[in-house]
């Protein structure tokens, strides 16, 4: 029996994200991601299962069975999945994949090649601990690797972000002056397997198809070699021409990231969100640490203290000017993180060097799957373990 494909109306990205009526649903983060894919007019999805990503891609597979996606398959491993999705993107179709922790690390060689080949796609990351020892618990250490890979990287706080930013990722990735992969990360389990309220437009609406003839690198057809490196073979030689070509490609990726800022500002409503601007004590965080920081902020206000909060939405490109403006009056800055290396603290210190006199406190920092109680954040704010008891 022939599959009856669902009838969806193509609407503009602006209408879908900002104007269409929305209804609220109490769903998991995995469901939120798949609901975004349902409305994204995706041509192909390829992935290899790994906890906590597996449920999302299982649901995306269901969308294929229902006719919302044109093609879908499970790859033999992460290297195969990421290589195949790159090849699919080169043919001019809209693509997405996903992974977590060790799976991402296994395929990092391919992931780092995407930006240089200028392949637009969306990569969903459900963050988890990187082995060893083995753990499937939430921890976003893998983002330390992603922010140096050339990909555009968003770090979602909650279910609503995960839904909206996944849709926005397809739009931004395919802009002619961008033409880069967009990674949308969320902290595993805290969001993927927990339920939260998400406002969504009707599933009868979808994005326009990818316009592959309006991008920085042409798609594969009968007149274009199959991959960019085949057209630029001298880069494989050991001479000054190859050195210059490689350097220019790196500059090209950086420039494309910089050009993406205006689209991120438009579709994510800014690269940062600032609560209580001008406060002398500021919390700067991304991902699930933002949610915990919001609660700590409310508890501090109940005790008579005005604390500010900067939510970092985009890790690449990093909101340099926005962060400097938000922290210009700060005397102390707290950086809570769900990882052991403190990659966000490092970014903030580099950004504010010679632009702020604030004392930057590198923590609290939890990892390996442990939660971050608001009391812990308050202890770091007030530098007193007894203060918030």
Show the residue positions of the predicted features:
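A general structural motif
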Residues: 134-136, 252-269, 284-292, 312-319
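Generic long, charged, amphipathic alpha-helical segments
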Residues: 293-326
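Conformationally flexible catalytic loops at phosphate/diphosphate-handling active centers
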Residues: 3, 181-273
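Thiamine diphosphate
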Residues: 1-145, 150-151, 167, 187, ...
């Amino acid at each position: 029996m022939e599959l009856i494909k669902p009838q969806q109306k193509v609407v503009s990205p602006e209408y879908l994200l900002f104007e269409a009526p929305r209804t609220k649903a109490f769903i998991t983060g995995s469901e939120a991601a798949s609901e975004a894919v349902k409305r994204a007019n995706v041509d192909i999805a390829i992935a290899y299962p790994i906890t906590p990503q597996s449920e999302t891609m299982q649901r995306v597979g269901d969308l294929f069975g229902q006719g919302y996606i044109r093609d879908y398959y499970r790859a033999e491993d992460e290297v195969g999945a990421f290589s195949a999705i790159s090849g699919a993107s080169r043919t001019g179709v809209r693509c997405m994949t996903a992974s977590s922790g060790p799976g991402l690390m296994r395929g990092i060689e391919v992931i780092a090649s995407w930006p240089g080949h200028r392949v637009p796609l969306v990569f969903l990351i459900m963050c988890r601990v990187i082995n060893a020892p083995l753990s499937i618990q939430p921890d976003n250490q893998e983002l330390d690797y992603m922010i140096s890979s050339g990909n555009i990287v968003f770090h979602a706080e909650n279910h609503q972000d995960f839904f909206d930013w996944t849709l926005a990722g397809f739009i931004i990735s395919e802009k002619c002056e961008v033409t880069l992969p967009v990674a949308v990360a969320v902290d595993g389990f805290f969001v993927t397997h927990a339920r939260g309220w998400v406002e969504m437009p009707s599933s009868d609406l979808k994005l326009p198809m990818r316009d592959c003839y309006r991008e920085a690198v042409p798609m594969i057809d009968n007149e274009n070699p199959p991959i960019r490196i085949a057209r630029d073979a001298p880069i494989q030689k050991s001479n000054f021409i190859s050195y210059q070509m490689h350097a220019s490609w790196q500059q090209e990726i950086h420039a494309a990231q910089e050009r993406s800022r205006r689209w991120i500002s438009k579709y994510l409503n800014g690269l940062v969100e600032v609560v209580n601007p001008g406060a002398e004590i500021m919390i700067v965080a991304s991902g699930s640490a933002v949610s915990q920081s919001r609660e700590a902020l409310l508890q501090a206000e109940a005790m008579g203290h005005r604390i500010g909060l900067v939510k970092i939405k985009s890790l690449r490109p990093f909101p340099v000017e926005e962060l400097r403006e938000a922290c210009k009056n700060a005397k102390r800055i707290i950086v809570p993180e769900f990882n052991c290396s403190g990659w966000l603290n490092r970014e903030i210190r580099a950004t504010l060097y010679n632009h702020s006199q604030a004392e930057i406190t590198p923590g609290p920092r939890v990892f390996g799957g442990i939660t971050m109680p608001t009391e812990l954040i308050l202890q770091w704010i007030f530098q007193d373990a007894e203060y918030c008891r």
